[in-house]
């Protein structure tokens, strides 16, 4: 028989839903939307870093950072 500890009793509710899966697609479409938005964010950051997007009056030179 497994040893019962106070920490185990506290953490037991967190493991109560183990193995249960929501039927159907669940929240997959929401995750897809957020992944798409994150991809757009990364592309914008990459284009700013690569100077593909020209920002008016913003100098993207490492010398000016110092």
From Swiss-Prot:
Q: What keyword terms does UniProt attach to this protein?
A: Chloroplast, Membrane, Photosynthesis, Photosystem II, Plastid, Thylakoid, Transmembrane, Transmembrane helix
Q: Chief localization class?
A: plastid
Transmembrane segments annotated in the record for this chain? 29-49
Q: How does it sit in the membrane?
A: Single-pass membrane protein
Alphabetically, the GO molecular function entries are:
phosphate ion binding
Compartments in which it is found: Plastid, Chloroplast thylakoid membrane
Please name the GO terms of the biological process aspect recorded for this protein, alphabetically.
Answer: photosynthesis; protein stabilization
Q: Which InterPro entries does UniProt cross-reference here?
A: PSII_PsbH, PSII_PsbH_sf
The family database entries (Pfam families) matched by this protein are listed as: PsbH
| GO cellular component labels | chloroplast thylakoid membrane; photosystem II
**Protein family (similarity comment):** Belongs to the PsbH family.
Provide the assembly information: PSII is composed of 1 copy each of membrane proteins PsbA, PsbB, PsbC, PsbD, PsbE, PsbF, PsbH, PsbI, PsbJ, PsbK, PsbL, PsbM, PsbT, PsbX, PsbY, PsbZ, Psb30/Ycf12, at least 3 peripheral proteins of the oxygen-evolving complex and a large number of cofactors. It forms dimeric complexes.
Q: What does this protein do?
A: One of the components of the core complex of photosystem II (PSII), required for its stability and/or assembly. PSII is a light-driven water:plastoquinone oxidoreductase that uses light energy to abstract electrons from H(2)O, generating O(2) and a proton gradient subsequently used for ATP formation. It consists of a core antenna complex that captures photons, and an electron transfer chain that converts photonic excitation into a charge separation.
Q: Which HAMAP family match?
A: PSII_PsbH (MF_00752)
| Record-given protein name | Photosystem II reaction center protein H
């Amino acid at each position: 028989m497994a040893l019962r500890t106070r920490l185990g009793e506290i953490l037991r509710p967190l493991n109560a839903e183990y193995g249960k899966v929501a039927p159907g697609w669940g929240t997959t479409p929401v995750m897809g939307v957020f992944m798409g938005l994150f991809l757009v964010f990364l592309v914008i950051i990459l284009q700013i870093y690569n100077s593909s997007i020209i920002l008016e009056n913003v100098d993207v030179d490492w010398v000016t950072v110092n």
